[in-house]
Swiss-Prot record:
GO terms for cellular component: extracellular region. Belongs to the colipase family. InterPro entries: Colipase. Disulfide bonds join C34-C45, C40-C56, C44-C78, C66-C86, C80-C97. It is found in: Secreted. Residues 1-21 form the signal peptide. It comes from Homo sapiens (Human). GO terms for molecular function: enzyme activator activity. Keywords: Disulfide bond, Secreted, Signal. GO terms for biological process: digestion; lipid catabolic process; response to food. This is Colipase-like protein 2.
Length: 100
């Protein structure tokens, strides 16, 4: 009985069910305004330095500049698309998406 009450309390508090924005059909499209990378279908909420906000952007393609992961809510540079790895082949150059 206690387990059932804990489950109901978790559902009511939103701890058990995922947020609506986490479901793919509710994710934002490219160019939509965002506050967190998890809101975007691409997984990249890029900072817009001109307007001070952020927008959903596509992930980096092969040989494009990238950052391997997001440490905060928004990205400075988007991570690579699926199947690509964000690495630097030269210590003097920035990271880019490569197939490995």
């Amino acid at each position: 009985m206690a387990a059932a009450l804990a489950l109901v309390a978790g559902v009511l508090s939103g701890a058990v069910l995922p947020l609506w924005s986490a479901l793919p059909q509710y994710k934002k499209k490219i160019t939509d305004r965002c506050f967190h990378h998890s809101e975007c279908y691409s997984g990249c909420c890029l900072m817009d330095l001109d307007s001070g906000g952020a927008f959903c952007a596509p992930r980096a393609r092969i040989t494009m500049i990238c950052l391997p992961q997001t440490k905060g809510a928004t990205n400075i540079i988007c991570p690579c698309r699926m199947g690509l790895t964000c690495i630097s082949k030269d210590l003097m150059c920035s990271r880019r998406c490569h197939m490995i």
